[in-house]
Swiss-Prot record:
Gene3D superfamilies: Homeodomain-like. Its main location: nucleus. Residues 402-426, 454-478 bind DNA. It comes from Dictyostelium discoideum. Residues 20-47, 87-101, 126-203 have a biased composition (Low complexity). It holds the Pfam family Myb_DNA-binding. This is Myb-like protein C. Transcription activator required for the culmination, at the time of the fruiting body formation. Regulates genes involved in the cell differentiation within the fruiting body. Keywords: Activator, Developmental protein, DNA-binding, Nucleus, Repeat, Transcription, Transcription regulation. It is found in: Nucleus. Residues 484-546 form the Myb-like domain. Residues 361-371 have a biased composition (Basic residues). PROSITE patterns: HTH_MYB, MYB_LIKE.
Amino acid sequence: MTMINPLSYPVPSQYSYTYNNNNNNSNNSSNNNSNNNSNNNNNNNNNCGVPNVSYGSNLNQQSMAQDLRVPEQYSISSPSPKKRPFNSTMTTSPPTPTLLSNSPYIHGSHIVPQYSPQLQNVYNTPHQSSHSIHQPPQQTPNIFNNNNNNNNNNEKSNNQNFGNTLFNSITNNSSNSSNSLIQQNNLTNNGSSSSSSSSSSTNFNQNNNFINSSNDSIYNSNICSFYGNTSSSSSSSLNGIESPPSVELMDDDIEDQLREYISPVIWGMMDNYAREQFYNAIVEFINEEISFRSLLLELRVIAVMDVNYKSIFQFLVDLFLSIEPNQKMVNYLRDNGVEENEFNIDLKSLELSSDNDSNQKKKRERIRKSVSRGLRNPPNKWAKEESQKLIQLVHEHGDKQWKKIAHQIGGGKTGAQCAQHWKRVLCPAIRKGSWDEDEESKLFNLVEKHGQSWKNVASEIRTRTDIQCRYQYFKSCMSREVQWSSREDEILQKKVSENNQQDGTININNTRDISWMDVSKAMARGRQTKIPRTALECKTRYFQLNFGGAPIQIVVPHNDDHLNNPHSPLNSLLQDQNCY
């Protein structure tokens, strides 16, 4: 490994022995200074970008001319680049899922293609455990630790929010299972571990220089930062390939299943350059530099080493549709630039299945609502036979035992509904139609007594329901807010004369025989006002025009307390000059 010239970059005296002492002394020094450098060692173990190697006598054989300065793009003082490379060596792919079992690349023994030198450099290198070098704790000045720590912290923060951010941007109203799908692109981003010392070799130290102009070695040494850091002290080999890294199981089984789908594509079907492209596209999308449509455009050009899946874009489209095969997902992908020929499913059959599913869902919803209505809130419509049976049962059991009556009627009717239907519709004491002047005057007196407690008002009126009382009261108040016109006065005088005419003469003294309800209906036919005049209003207006003076006081039998109160709501309503 190429080291930094201590003459060019001054090193404190307490660290200078690591450049001159041999391997045996380094072990003793590490034990003596373990307490002082514990925090530094923890940081070094978390940084998979800087390999921990021993600095023995083999480094002294290298001439000082070989110690070059740090390149400008990787200078110590320069900030970390925007698009950061990966931070660890690549590990092998996990077992192949069922979805990719037909792939010509995955099928068989996972042989690395010849045109992928990066993969062969890692995968096809024999496991040389006998030549491994003991690695003492890192005690040299952490020249690259600051930058690497910043990179790792940024990458961890991005990776932690990667799944939720990307999923919320991709499928706004999709199911929660799609969130697990996008999270698998991290491939255990939050897992933290250090590289194994037993699997390191001299060949690894020679071919993986951190300061190197070759981008391949940088990608090769920094891949762990995005795809997750893994560790395994003992790894078995299969056909010359190490076993897949140990992955911590998630709480949700769906996440484990989705990881099995995506892991073979990322690890076994993409080279380092494709992973770099994929990583940069994801970072730009998370930083809201590009839209989801632009992200799909960039994913189109990232090729994978499989003839079945030409790009990671096509793989993700197929995976989206396999996770959520419905028309809603198809429409969303179409809106973001996916063409018809890029769907590897039969859209017509999908539409038919979606229609069937929607119909079944609507049918289940109707059944659920009907059952709910039948048990708790059945429809208000009563059949003629049910109404007749209710009348018969009320005559037999009275108007108090509504639960017993409802049980005998059946059909999901409750006792409250039977009582309501009887009191509001079927009770012979309840009057229908217009209110006469006596009912209306009694209504205003009861409103003055009980306020707008319509149940109490209706219980004393006895001939009207609570709904009828409420409606009539507000209609009367609104009608009195409109002043009488001269045309209305003429029609009122004419209708009263026609109703009270006897033998061609008008009996002014016999106003009790006048049907003010008929007069009110005749006034309503003239359509002079939007709200028809009530019977009490017509009577009051007629006495004001013919007899003069203050409006007539309506006396309700057995309840004349309101006459003693000149400021009562009834008298104030009747005496309001704007009403006449």
